[in-house]
Amino acid sequence: MKISIIGGGAWGSTLAQLLTDNNHQILINEINLEYVNKINNGIHPIFNQILKDVKATVSLSETLEFSDFIVLCLPTRVMRLTLRKINKIISQPKYFINVSKGMEIENYKIIYQIVQEEITIQNIKNYACVMGPSHAEDVILRKLTLLVAASLDFSFACKVQKIFYNYNYLRVYSSNDLYGVEICSAFKNVLALISGVLDSFDFGYNFQAGFISRGLLEMAKVVDFFKGDKQTVFGLTGLGDLIVTAFNENSRNYQAGKKIGLGMEIKDIIKNSSQSIEGINNLKAFYNLSLEKKIDLPIVKEAYQMIFNYKSIKIILNNLLKRPLKLEKIF
């Protein structure tokens, strides 16, 4: 099968190798010419591992003509604009598979909703996402990984499941909870960012565990708002992805949070990062969502005040600890 990947960074190039291992033909579209040259010379652009039989081009039209399966692997901030370009180029319907984890700041749309708005319905054969605890640096080394393929059309989720499944190192589960999976995958970026901030202050494991538990509850509230399945929060794309992101030194969001806690300016963190840090924009998105839709997300709200309005950690913790005492109720 031929598969086109839009975005050849850390994750896009890694998935290209996985799909090539699965005997698919891959063409990556990447705007960074240096990345394109490295990929075409058989080298992963970020990790410098060997890539076999993976090709890349700067031409978006060439990539779209290559196959009917389009894998979206882009930062959320450029997703809408890129989809508009795609919609102008394609002349026949495509299958869209999203592997990007994020939410738009302005209108808190997940990637599925952005695709619906920017790609005319006649150009969409079907849509799925593939998410889960999956640091690219492990997958490129073919370390064991578990993911979830989700679609509103369960039969298509199962089709995508088989495309990505590799019996040697990557197992894929299927789901029809598309909204829940994409929300969890975006929200965990926020919790990982906050986890990094907390670690920089060395509050200890007790508080870290409490924060994660209550953070999952807030994740569930957002999933419920989007009419997703709250049980998804405790699966691979919720708790699973949170574990690998919130406590891992290789996590961009966790590292960004640590730097914020140590006093580094956000603009400098973004400037010095070669890869997208989705947690920063996702925090803004979920904060705005909580205000407009009146969703009670105390951790998100206080984290926003600390990170963007420079409130002291002492004030933030006092605000959280002085909330009215109540029954622990999960759902």
UniProtKB/Swiss-Prot annotation:
Its main location: cytoplasm. The active site is at K188 (proton acceptor). PROSITE patterns: NAD_G3PDH. Disulfide bonds: none annotated. Keywords: Cytoplasm, Lipid biosynthesis, Lipid metabolism, NAD, NADP, Nucleotide-binding, Oxidoreductase, Phospholipid biosynthesis, Phospholipid metabolism. Coiled coil: none annotated. GO terms for molecular function: glycerol-3-phosphate dehydrogenase [NAD(P)+] activity; NAD binding. The keyword Transmembrane does not apply. InterPro entries: 6-PGluconate_DH-like_C_sf (IPR008927), 6PGD_dom2 (IPR013328), G3P_DH_NAD-dep (IPR006168), G3P_DH_NAD-dep_C (IPR006109), G3P_DH_NAD-dep_N (IPR011128), NAD(P)-bd_dom_sf (IPR036291). Pathway: Membrane lipid metabolism; glycerophospholipid metabolism. NADPH binds at W11, K101, A136, R252, E278. Catalyzes the reduction of the glycolytic intermediate dihydroxyacetone phosphate (DHAP) to sn-glycerol 3-phosphate (G3P), the key precursor for phospholipid synthesis. This is Glycerol-3-phosphate dehydrogenase [NAD(P)+].
